A protein has these predicted regions:
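C-terminal motif of bacterial Sec signal peptides marking the signal peptidase cleavage site
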Residues: 13-15
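N-terminal capping segment at the start of a domain
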Residues: 18, 25-51, 67, 72-73, ...
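Extracellular/luminal Protease-associated
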Residues: 20, 107-217, 281, 310, ...
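Catalytic-core environment of secreted peptidases
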Residues: 25-43, 48-71, 146, 150-171, ...
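Noncatalytic luminal/extracellular "stalk/propeptide" segments of secretory-pathway proteins
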Residues: 41-159
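Soluble metallo-hydrolase cores and metallopeptidase-like ectodomains found primarily
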Residues: 99, 111-144, 213-312, 328-332
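Metal-dependent peptidase/peptidase-like ectodomains
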Residues: 105, 216-238, 346-444
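His/Asp/Glu-rich mid-to-C-terminal helical/loop segments that flank catalytic regions of hydrolases
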Residues: 328, 332, 443-489
Length: 489
């Protein structure tokens, strides 16, 4: 980071001429061109730490270099960090058997997906329904059933109800898989709640939870598939959830079906990945060592088995392309700013905000030097703009709202307290945050359908322009860092 200060001293030459004239303008054409590449089959969903993620990172670093941003780390735009990594390798299989006889093979992507941190395995065994997959003294889905050498079918999430004085364990898949393994299971299948108004379809996800890797197959199946496994039992899946929820007691039993699951994985406990960071230097003698951070996560949830990939156009190729486009606005128009701007593309948001957490703790300077952090995540699908964290940084929120009121006028009033996603690690350090997102942005979240053609070009251009104008005002010194009004951990 010392080199940044040196670069700032060398490059930040104060000009007497007015450099406020804008020649390069934000364009949805340029934004969507970048999104199209980042969400392409070539980049296979940009799984953090993967070869394809590094292709995306190198592409963005090259763009940073071409517009003249200063590298964050000596001569590199990369900030290295180590993350847990898991890749689903070719070729996978998931099939239904009855009485040990093959019935049907399911389609990856349509009928099921592997959890991002699924273990490997080649198994064919009876399936046992185990409710919520919880095993604690006060409530035990495993107490009256033998799952040794079998495959567990469990609801993906924990109950919406509580028992007095009882705190549920984590509902993340690693914890449920760990519990299943401890009881002797050799695999686990997750299904969404059948009684939800819109039960969640299988989605790509690398969010796994704490603890060691659980090396058994872990898959998320859709409701029709789950019902085919339940078929022949006393209850339907809907009836099972209703009965368990109403009586608040476990109801587990062996099913009259078997599952064959084959999956190979490449698991690495510590794999190197990178944040991509470029600096636009400020010129004011007093303020140039202060930073405005504009960030978005570059990673998504990857692909599986060489058969499918999750494009991640809105999540978050849109935010990444917007960071690049705003950087171009500053650099190509040679805008003169008092503060410096740090343009950041984070790795591994999807597995737990790891890139953002790493940068927040390894800035190379006091975090009090960060005037504000602006985060862009899922900003191109929907119909309006929402600015998060307004309850924690009301002055910053009002500033952005006032800018929008004289421009696109797309912002709604709703906001929240706290950071959210990659903004959270910075919020926890007391840094004012603004979270740019769009209303109704999650229609295709982590789905195979999150493609560039689902995006709203006009909205996308508008929110990117708002992020640019807000960043510019902060960089010009028209906002002073405020004390966080409402802290959320």
């Amino acid at each position: 980071m010392k080199n940044i200060i040196i670069w700032l001293l060398l490059i930040a030459l104060v000009s007497c001429s007015d450099k406020s004239e804008v020649n390069y303008e934000i364009s949805s054409v340029n934004l969507l061109k970048t999104v199209s590449y980042l969400s392409s089959k070539e980049l296979q969903g940009r799984l953090g730490g993967s070869k394809e993620y590094f292709e995306a990172a190198n592409f963005m670093a090259k763009e940073f270099a071409e517009i003249g941003l200063i590298p964050f780390n000596k001569n590199s735009y990369f900030q290295n960090l180590k993350v847990e990594y898991n890749q689903i390798l070719p070729k996978a299989e998931f099939s239904l058997y009855k009485d040990r006889n093959f019935v049907k093979k399911y389609n990856l992507g349509k009928d099921y997906v592997f959890r991002g941190f699924s273990g490997a395995g080649d198994i064919n065994a009876q399936v046992v329904f185990a409710g919520y997959g919880i095993s604690i003294p006060e409530y035990d889905d495993y107490k009256n059933v033998d799952v040794k050498g079998k495959i567990v079918l469990a609801f993906k999430y924990n109950p919406s109800w509580n028992l007095e004085g009882v705190k549920w364990s984590s509902s993340l898949p690693r914890e449920k898989a760990r519990v299943a393994l401890e009881h002797g299971a050799i695999g686990i299948m997750f299904v969404s709640f059948p009684n939800d108004e819109k039960p969640q379809e299988p989605i790509g996800s690398t969010m796994h939870g704490n603890g060691e890797q659980v090396n058994i197959p872990q898959i998320h199946i859709n409701l029709p598939v789950a019902n085919e496994f339940i078929e022949g039992s006393k209850y339907t899946l809907k009836e099972l959830q209703t009965k368990i929820d109403s009586e608040k007691t476990s109801l587990s039993f062996a099913l009259k079906s078997e599952a064959k699951i084959f999956v190979e994985t490449e698991y690495v406990k510590e794999k190197v990945t990178v944040n991509v960071i470029g600096i636009y230097p400020g010129t004011d003698e007093k303020l140039k060592d202060e930073f405005v951070i504009l960030g978005a996560h570059l990673d998504h949830v990857g692909g599986q088995s060489g058969e499918i990939y999750f494009p991640g156009a809105n999540d978050n190729a849109s935010g990444s392309a917007a960071v690049l486009e705003v950087a171009r606005m500053f650099a190509k128009n040679e805008l003169e700013t008092k503060r410096s701007v740090m343009f950041v593309l984070f790795s591994n948001e999807e597995s737990g905000l790891e890139g953002a957490e790493f940068l927040a703790n390894n800035l190379g300077f006091d975090s009090n030097k960060v005037t504000a952090m602006l985060n862009m995540d899922c900003i191109a699908h929907g119909d309006s703009i929402q600015l998060g964290n307004g309850k924690s940084a009301p002055k910053l929120w009002e500033l952005a709202k006032s800018i929008d009121s004289t421009n696109a006028k797309l912002t709604i009033n709703g906001t929240w307290a706290g950071g959210g996603a990659d903004a959270s690690p910075f919020h926890e350090k007391g840094i004012p945050i603004l979270y740019f997102v769009t209303k109704f942005s999650y229609t295709h979240l982590h789905c195979l359908t999150d493609k560039v053609e689902t995006l709203n070009p006009k909205l996308y251009e508008g929110i990117t322009n708002l992020a640019y104008l807000t960043t510019l005002k902060l960089a010009k010194g028209e906002y002073e860092r405020e004390v966080i009004a409402e802290r959320v951990k």
